[in-house]
Amino acid sequence: IAGVDLVALDISKPMKAQGAAIVEVNAGPGLLMHLKPATGKPRPVGQAIAAHLFAPESEPRIPVVGVIGQENTTGTSHLIAWLLHLQGLQTGLSSAKGLFLGQRCLQNQSGMEWESAQRLLINRSVEAAVFETTARHLLSEGLPYDRCLVGVITAMPKAEGLQDLYIQSDEQMPNVVRTQMDVVLPNGMAVLNADDAEVVNLAQY
């Protein structure tokens, strides 16, 4: 989207015939002059830009998979990302091992921090994304996405080491971990580890 400023007597007529000229091409145009012009009536340019970028029949969300648990979450996240990659999707992965785009490693330190994970969501080439998180990241930073298509819970994390975040006992953990289920879209699904009784109990939600 660019803004083109031109001087013309009549914009409906060819420029050459009336000596019109382009004054400026702006890669980041302001919308205020169109929404609140000094003269003339306002134009819904924001709506027109959004309609151009997102057609009515287009899907505004990419498939997002969230993974949380006590152990095996990193391996699970990498496996899911690989399966999505095999489907031909340009897949972003945020895990304890780093930040990945397809088979390329963008960051070889933990990519679970909110800002690191956001790098995937703002990347226009990403067609699917997998996010590994921990109870600590969930409590301190929240999830880097608002909703997901699939939420995976591999095990019920322990409360040990979370006292600074007001988690004193293991009994509080289901209320923390169920967040991964609560953000699943209505047309999505939660995947619970049936070998973990505490995780299975989350099915009631």
Task: List each model region and its residues.
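Acidic, Mg2+-coordinating active-site environments of NTP-dependent enzymes
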Residues: 61, 146, 150-205
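Conserved nucleotide-sensing/catalytic segment adjacent to the nucleotide-binding pocket
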Residues: 104-141
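Hydrophobic anchor at the start of a short beta-strand
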Residues: 90-92, 128, 190
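Walker A (P-loop) phosphate-binding motif
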Residues: 56-102
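Residue-level signal for inorganic ion chemistry
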Residues: 5, 94, 132, 191
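ATP-dependent carboxylate activation and anion-phosphoryl transfer catalytic cores
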Residues: 1-68
